[in-house]
Amino acid sequence: YMNRKDLKIGVLYSTEESSSPIQVANLKEAAKSYPGMEILDSAVADITTIDAKTTELLSRGADCLVNLLDNTVVGKLETNILPLTNEARIPVFGSEIEQVKIGCLASASIDYITVGKSAGAAAAKILAGTPAGDIPVATITDPTVYYNSRVAAELRIAIPAEPGTDVA
């Protein structure tokens, strides 16, 4: 699905979460590496506008939606966003496994155990006297792929052989 040449990716984000506009900017920058990929973003001022903003992205031709690590938007995923996207047969890609379990198509996400080990290693360095500012920011280099075969069947999307772990 994501291998299409022209792909419009919709992304909802909250203006109340300081990291969300940064995540959108990073997504737009990454999309420049893929000719034909376009990011359609829509800022959500508060939770009462989520339905309208989701519908707006769908009417602008979004081929799929991508969730950021945005608690405001994720909090309305199951009750507001997924019913609208499912009706339109538009997949939503989550940012972590729990979102895939509740109805997103797939996610290349963090492994919380790995994150915990990394945080523990950083804490040990700090306790050993390393200033926190001297410890580099950790990034995910090997995400875990999760998918939901039930959602794929409902949306009539073929899943490639062995893409990751099925959580349906």
Predicted features and spans:
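Short hydrophobic alpha-helices and adjacent helix-cap/hinge residues
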Residues: 1-168
